[in-house]
Curated annotation (Swiss-Prot):
Gene that encodes it: OR2A7
Name of the featured protein: Olfactory receptor 2A7
GO molecular function: G protein-coupled receptor activity; odorant binding; olfactory receptor activity
Keyword Ribosomal protein: no
GO biological process: detection of chemical stimulus involved in sensory perception of smell
Role this protein plays: Odorant receptor.
Family: Belongs to the G-protein coupled receptor 1 family.
């Protein structure tokens, strides 16, 4: 047994059990989505950096969300594309651990950033006269750093619990990336502590932040209904709708994965939900939350106009 435990240093990601033609089709589609993700979020980062009119708390947090979305895609998609072309290409033990750690880090960070963005919107709509006094740059930087730091620290806990586990079972991971629960199934030791920590982290990451978001939006809705100007009211509703779409995509997939009903093959369901979460969410977020914003669109038009003139 000891020899088996120490001999496994590489693992195979089985990905999608489809034929070669479907694999090539998926490779083309996922490559296209990956490019759109990098292009959309990269555009948001570039526009916010270039235009001083976008140097405001709202766009500061949007830029961090764009960074998380790029990181999400870069952590999972390149390896997934390699596996579609070369299904037998293994991933190293260190690579597996790093991918698991980074995915958890980005998930927790995005969860907290969505809470911070909801709070920023709450202050902007419910306390507009005090907005600049409350959302100072010091507060904004503190909130962003706290989100990233919490994501790293919570993921380190999972990593510390995962590293000592021996792996002596067949080194095949039935997933398109090293998702922590899929990795735990390969361990030949008791993993109840690890699984309970993952469950506790998922529940606390859903219930606490989502409750805060719901309370924030209830206050926001009450404040919007009291606005006299129809134009201001419409603009506030549009901003809230964009944010709620992003929140719905993130928390919707997470809730279905962890607390939703199971039909058919739960493992396959979870795998495809995680695909949506790590590939489609990052691609859709800039379209929903940023590129529909009038100030961002105006900046994009100005940049494109300058490029055409040159």
């Amino acid at each position: 047994m000891g020899d088996n435990i120490t001999s496994i240093t590489e693992f195979l990601l089985l990905g999608f059990p489809v034929g070669p033609r479907i694999q090539m089709l998926l490779f083309g589609l996922f490559s296209l989505f990956y490019v759109f993700t990098l292009l959309g979020n990269g555009t948001i980062l570039g526009l916010i950096s270039l235009d001083s009119r976008l140097h405001a708390p709202m766009y500061f947090f949007l830029s961090h969300l764009a960074v998380v979305d790029i990181a999400y895609a870069c952590n999972t998609v390149p390896r997934m594309l390699v596996n579609l072309l070369h299904p037998a290409k293994p991933i190293s033990f260190a690579g597996r651990m790093m991918q698991t750690f980074l995915f958890s880090t980005f998930a927790v960070t995005e969860c907290l950033l969505l809470v911070v963005m909801s709070y920023d919107l709450y202050v902007a709509i419910c306390h507009p006269l005090r907005y600049l006094a409350i959302m100072t740059w010091r507060v904004c930087i503190t909130l962003a750093v706290t989100s990233w730091t919490t994501g790293v620290l919570l993921s380190l806990i999972h990593l510390v619990l995962l590293l000592p586990l021996p792996f002596c079972r067949p080194q095949k991971i039935y997933h398109f990336f090293c998702e922590i629960l899929a990795v735990l199934k390969l361990a030949c030791a008791d993993t109840h502590i690890n699984e309970n920590m993952v469950l506790a982290g998922a529940i606390s990451g859903l219930v606490g932040p989502l409750s805060t978001i719901v309370v924030s939006y209830m206050c926001i809705l009450c404040a919007i209904l009291q606005i006299q100007s129809r134009e201001v009211q419409r603009k506030a509703f549009c901003t809230c709708f964009s944010h709620l779409c992003v929140i719905g995509l993130f928390y919707g997939t997470a809730i279905i994965m962890y607390v939703g009903p199971r039909y058919g093959n739960p493992k396959e369901q979870k795998k495809y939900l995680l695909l949506f979460h790590s590939l489609f969410n990052p691609m859709l977020n800039p379209l929903i939350c940023s590129l529909r914003n009038s100030e961002v669109k105006n900046t994009l038009k100005r940049v494109l106009g300058v490029e055409r003139a040159l």
